[in-house]
Amino acid sequence: MPDTISFARGAPSPDLIPVEAVRKATAKALEDDWKTALSYGVGIGHPGLCAWIADRHGLPAADQVMVTNGSLEAGGMLFSHLLGPGDRVVVEQPSYDRTLLMLKEIGVEFVPIPLESDGIDVDALEAALAEGPIKLAHIIPNFHNPAGCTLSEAKRHRLVAPAGEHDFVIFEDDPYRELPFGEVPPPPTMLSMDRADKVIHASSFSKTVSPGVRVGYL
């Protein structure tokens, strides 16, 4: 139907896609080194892109970044590596349906934690930790899909601390970080707060460049 805004998919409006910038970048890549641009790359991703992402997140080395086929694949790769049947996994309630389907296929035990206006209920998460070990917590920190909330900075610190103490991984699933309304950016990433190597961050260029490029990272 004309003039209908569809909420069925989390896709940017076509008029927001930077078509001219993508066209120029593609032309430059082909002009600078078309053989490399059109050949097989390395499995971890383009070295220049990995270095750019590492620098953006304050990481010491580009080899701490893996380029993926969107952020959903990043999550799938992480889950298949870390999780097995029966592992207790914290999920926000509500959460992104496709992520829940991937976790269900693995056979994890869901530990649903309700969302508040400033993100996940950390008190409820701490209560869940008292009931048994958690293997992973899946968190969408910014402009949550589908709830729309953003995790407060105070709660980010409160989440990072017990991850180290109780030895569980926080999967910071953050494809919407670059989409704030207004001039105020979202709070710092949990990755930047992590001192115990318990936060794994994923994001995507599907919302800012184009869904069709299918480029994300872990």
Q: What positions do the PLM features span?
A:
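Active-site PLP attachment segment
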Residues: 191-218
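N-terminal "arm"/small-domain region of PLP-dependent enzymes with the aminotransferase-like
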Residues: 1-44, 168
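Short aromatic-enriched loop/helix-cap "lid" or pocket-rim segments at secondary-structure transitions
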Residues: 17-21, 182-184, 212-214
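Gly/Ser/Thr-rich helix-start
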Residues: 9-11, 71, 149, 213, ...
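Short glycine-rich anion-binding loops that position phosphate/pyrophosphate groups of nucleotides
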Residues: 10-13, 141-145, 207
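Conserved core of the PLP fold type I
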Residues: 36-167, 178-196, 200
